[in-house]
Structures are given as structure tokens and as C-alpha cells.
A protein has these predicted regions:
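Structural motif
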Residues: 48-49, 155, 311
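N-terminal structural segment of carbohydrate-active enzymes
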Residues: 3-64, 94-96
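Short, solvent-exposed turn/loop segments enriched in Gly/Ser/Thr/Pro and often Arg
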Residues: 23-25, 55-63, 102-109, 161-171, ...
Length: 554
């Protein structure tokens, strides 16, 4: 059941299932930029669209503020106008719930204004192209953000979305080193408690930072909704998020650009993590966030919104303002028709306040979404790729979960996400745990109890080999449930399973069955080391060789 908050910003914001964000990361490098912005025209477009709530930019990634800040940079072409305040007031008058947008960490003005607070990555860089970063462990950066938040919260908004609460890279700045208190690990090694401990430090630091911002917002403006960017939940270890970000948010919210398969998994993940329904699923109305003009079809937008609603969430589409400050009316007319078409579905979801009755659960362990493929790489030589949440970041554990859920979707099997903090498994008949190598004792205890009570557990890979701090590694905590013991060795990066010789990539743990365990399939290895340049069976591939007696399926 959805909580009742009375006549508060939280209640007003969370009663909306159709939402809009107009991206506004426009610089002031040309005199014409933002000169044609009109709050009246902006509000006309929002009203035309038919949405119930609109998120308005108070400050963008450039650090340009759209109100008269005393603590940062005002967009130079506004000539002192408070377009944020005018827009928020106009939306309120029009009966549209206003929510503020603010960015942290990715804040060029703060990084330039306070250069000693910048992120310094593992190769010594303090920015990535156009983006300049500050470190969440730098107290002066936090103080700067709180000062701007205090200004923004003076306005009549019902909620605030704090963007970019994730690590843009592996920060090695002085504040991180001082807070960590130990030398940083020089080599990436997911089998080492030292490296895993460093990763947990990154996650805890970020969660603490997010919670401090949330607590500040609640002190300044009690009763409004506050949430953080949580899309990195599907990006793995590198961006450094944990379920602490969800705990610091009133509802799960974030933007995704990975298409249908990613959305189907993301909405169920958000439904599992959100503290207060509905969660908020954002995506661009253009083909991608990097594309300013090419629009998705009406059917694609409709099905995306419907997928979100079907899982109990609120849909939010992202448009992008033109550099001169104008908007394209054609889209808002299309959006109007789309919202009318979606109205009966919105009303049904709002009135029913339903929850998933699925009997199949897919276990999501954020702590386990690591990348063993980079084991052995020196930290100073590691390249983590572009530091943002706009692409689909490859991660073997996440890829396995996405593949598993796509199979369930094609079988028309209802499923839901179970998280590390889910205590109640009632209603579940089957639980699928995909290579969740890092599980806390309380998690393995719940899984063991689930099996004891008659549930079917499907676990893959290195599930339960370590605790969340990386300790263990000698045997599975759930070895008694699996019926196998770890030999201490792993396979090469290609294996084949059973008589069907099902191909798989990754270094899987090699095990031995205990007495009375029924082995239903064994592993087959290639005849030669994978991708050996001189010794191989086939020049293009690594075909199966001799069958082994290592269990693959028990």
C-alpha cells in the first residue's frame, strides 16, 4: 500500500505518474544561448503535453545556475533573471507539480572554483573531456553543494532530484587516501579482501555523501520528496553505487538508454529498491541523450511508458532545450496524444496500488556486480571508459541476469527482483541467483532457509564463495545446499556444459560433488588454452575437447 503523507510535497510529487524533464545543459559561450527562453512558453509546452509533474533545472553540469545564486555562477545570458523561480511559480499556478533538478559531483563550476576538491583518477586526470568532477569525500565540495541546495529549497518545489551521485572514476585524491587510511591497492584483484575492501570503501563513501545531502534537504524543507540518481544500479562496480543510494532516496529514480531488455529489468529492480512507490523510470524522447533531434516513434514511447506503469512506476520522458532556449512544439503535441492514450492505464495503476505476485524471484546482489576479467591489471594502467551513466556498461554478472530475465520474459513467466535487503520470501517458489559471489552471512542464511522451507534455488557461478568484504574464497557458504565443494581452481575462459555442450565464457569455479549429490551435467574444456596463438583446434574458435568429471549442473 502506498504511504499517505497528507498535503505535503512528498504526497503531491508521488501522486504523479506522468512526468517530464527538459534537459538544460546549455553553456553561455555564445551571446545567443538561452536568450529566447520564455517561462510562459515553457509552461505552455508542459501544459500542452498533459503531464502531471515537471522537473525544472536549477543548475546544470556546467555549473550554470538558472536563478540568482550567491554561491556560484549564474548563466551569463539571463541578465539577472530568475527563470527557475518564474518557471516553478508558473507551473504551480498551472496545477503542475514542480520538482527541482540539481547536480553534484559533475559540476564544472564547483570543480573550477574549488580545484583542490577535484577528483584525481587512477592515472592522474582530473576531468573527462567536457566534464569536470569533484570528490564526494571532499568536505568543501559538500559545503558548496549544501549552500546551493539551501538557495534552491527556498522555492516552492515539491521535490528535488539530485543527479550524478556516483563515482565518475576511481578517485585517488588526498581526501580519499586520508579517509581510507591504508595504501591503495596497486593491482586489481577481486579475489583479494584488500581490493574488495577498497571497493566497499568507495561504495560506503558515496552512500554517506548521498545521505548527508538527503538529511540536509530534509532539514531545510521537511515534507518534500528527495531522490538521487540510481541508474548506476545496472552499471556494475565502477560507478561505485550500492543499495545505500536507494536508502538515501525517498523513491528510486534514474535515466536509462539501454533499450527494451534493459528497461524490463530496470523497472523491476527499481520496484524492489524503492522505499516509497511509485519509482520513476526516465528515458529520452530522442533516440539517445546524445541525439538532440532524432525522435523515437510514438509506439516506442507508448510501450516504454506502458512497461513502467505495468510494474507500478511513474514514467518520465526527457526532452532537451534548444541552445537558444526554445522548445519544439511538435513533440509536445505528440506527447499530449500519448498521455491521453496512457490515461486509463495511469488511473488503474494509481487506484490499484498493486504489487508483484510473481512466484519466481531473480536475486540482485549489487555487491557481486564486479568484473573478474580485469584481475591482474595495475590500477595505474586501468581504463574504465567514459565516466557517465548514458551507455550500457558491460559486466558479466549483469549480462547473465539480463539474459536470464529475457528467457523468463520469452517464456511469459512472471518474475520479480529480490535484493540483498529483502527479508520476506513469502510467495516465492523459485529463486534464481546469478553468480552472486559476494553475499553477507544473513543473505546466505535466508537462502538456506528458503530451500529448507521447500523453495527451489537455482544458483550459478561463484555464488556465495565470498562474503561482502571479499573474505572466504575457500568454499561456498552454501556448499551444503549446492552439494559440491570448491577445489580452489577455476576453468579457462571457455567451457561447455552437459551433453548439449552449451557454450559459456568466464572462469568458472571447479568443484567436486559430495556423496549423494546427483550430477546432471559435467564440464567440457577446449583441448588447448583458450586463444593460444600457436596451439589450437580451430583458428576461429575454441571448440570442445575432452569431457571432464567436474560438475556443471547438480
Amino acid at each position: 500500500m502506498q504511504p499517505v503523507f497528507g498535503d505535503t510535497g512528498m504526497n503531491r510529487a508521488q501522486s504523479c505518474y506522468s512526468r517530464l524533464l527538459i534537459d538544460n545543459h546549455i553553456t553561455d559561450l555564445k551571446d545567443s544561448y538561452m536568450r529566447k527562453f520564455s517561462p510562459e512558453e515553457y509552461i505552455r509546452m508542459v501544459r500542452l503535453s498533459g503531464v502531471e509533474s515537471a522537473m525544472v533545472y536549477a543548475c546544470d553540469h556546467n555549473g550554470n545556475c538558472y536563478y540568482p545564486t550567491q554561491a556560484g555562477h549564474i548563466h551569463a545570458n539571463l541578465d539577472g533573471r530568475d527563470i527557475f523561480g518564474e518557471t516553478v511559480a508558473g507551473l504551480r499556478k498551472a496545477g503542475i507539480v514542480p520538482v527541482a533538478y540539481y547536480t553534484v559531483n559533475y559540476h564544472n563550476d564547483c570543480a573550477r572554483r574549488l580545484p583542490h576538491t577535484r577528483v584525481i583518477d587512477n592515472v592522474g586526470m582530473d576531468h573527462d573531456g567536457r566534464y569536470h568532477f569533484t570528490c564526494p569525500n571532499q568536505p568543501e565540495a559538500l559545503a558548496f553543494y549544501e549552500t546551493q541546495l539551501a538557495e534552491i529549497l527556498q522555492y516552492d518545489v515539491d521535490g528535488i532530484f539530485i543527479d550524478m551521485t556516483f563515482w565518475p572514476t576511481i578517485c585517488c585524491c588526498s581526501a580519499c587516501r586520508e579517509k581510507y587510511g591504508n595504501p591503495f591497492q596497486e593491482v586489481i584483484d577481486w579475489d583479494s579482501p584488500d581490493w574488495v575492501g577498497f571497493q566497499r570503501f568507495r561504495e560506503r563513501s558515496l552512500a554517506e555523501f548521498a545521505q548527508k545531502l538527503t538529511d540536509f534537504v530534509r532539514r531545510m524543507k521537511p515534507g518534500i520528496a528527495v531522490t538521487h540518481q540510481f541508474s548506476p544500479v545496472l552499471h556494475g562496480w565502477y560507478l561505485g553505487q550500492s543499495d545505500g543510494i536507494a536508502a538515501a532516496s525517498d523513491y528510486a529514480s534514474g535515466d536509462f538508454y539501454g533499450g527494451r531488455t534493459q528497461q524490463r529489468f530496470a523497472v523491476k529492480t527499481f520496484a524492489a529498491y524503492t522505499r516509497i512507490p511509485p519509482f520513476e523510470f526516465m528515458t529520452s524522447r530522442c533516440v539517445s541523450l546524445n541525439d538532440h533531434t532524432s525522435a523515437k516513434s510514438d509506439e516506442e514511447l507508448f510501450l516504454s511508458a506502458l512497461t513502467t506503469l505495468a510494474n507500478g512506476g511513474a514514467y518520465l520522458f526527457i526532452d532537451a532545450i534548444n541552445p537558444d532556449g526554445t522548445l519544439e512544439e511538435t513533440f509536445y503535441r505528440r506527447f499530449h496524444d500519448l498521455n491521453r492514450r496512457l490515461e486509463p492505464f495511469r488511473n488503474a495503476v494509481r487506484n490499484l496500488n498493486g504489487h508483484s505476485a510473481a512466484s519466481v524471484g531473480v536475486y540482485f546482489s549489487m555487491a557481486s556486480c564486479v568484473n573478474r576479467a580485469i584481475n591482474g591489471i595495475e590500477l595505474k594502467k586501468f581504463n574504465g571508459g567514459r565516466a557517465n551513466n548514458m551507455s550500457v556498461r558491460k559486466n558479466a554478472v549483469l549480462d547473465e541476469m539480463l539474459g536470464m530475465t529475457e528467457v523468463l520474459n520469452r517464456l511469459h513467466t512472471q518474475w520479480k527482483v529480490i535484493t540483498s535487503s529483502t527479508a520476506d520470501f513469502s510467495g516465492l517458489e523459485t529463486l534464481i541467483v546469478c553468480n552472486a559471489a559476494y553475499l553477507a552471512p544473513e543473505e546466505t542464511g535466508r537462502l538456506r532457509e528458503f530451500v529448507r522451507n521447500g523453495g527451489t534455488l537455482i544458483a550459478t557461478g561463484a555464488t556465495s564463495l565470498y562474503d561482502t568484504e571479499g573474505c572466504g574464497g575457500k568454499n561456498f557458504a552454501l556448499a551444503d545446499v549446492f552439494g559440491v565443494d570448491y577445489t580452489g581452481k577455476r576453468s579457462d575462459s571457455v567451457t561447455y556444459t552437459g551433453t548439449e555442450l552449451i557454450y559459456a565464457e568466464g572462469n568458472v569455479p571447479l568443484t567436486r560433488p559430495v556423496p549423494e549429490t546427483e550430477v546432471r551435467g559435467t564440464l567440457t574444456f577446449p583441448d588447448f588454452p583458450v586463444n593460444d596463438p600457436e596451439r589450437y583446434a580451430s583458428i576461429h574458435s575454441n571448440p570442445p575437447g575432452e569431457k571432464t568429471d567436474f560438475p556443471a549442473l547438480t
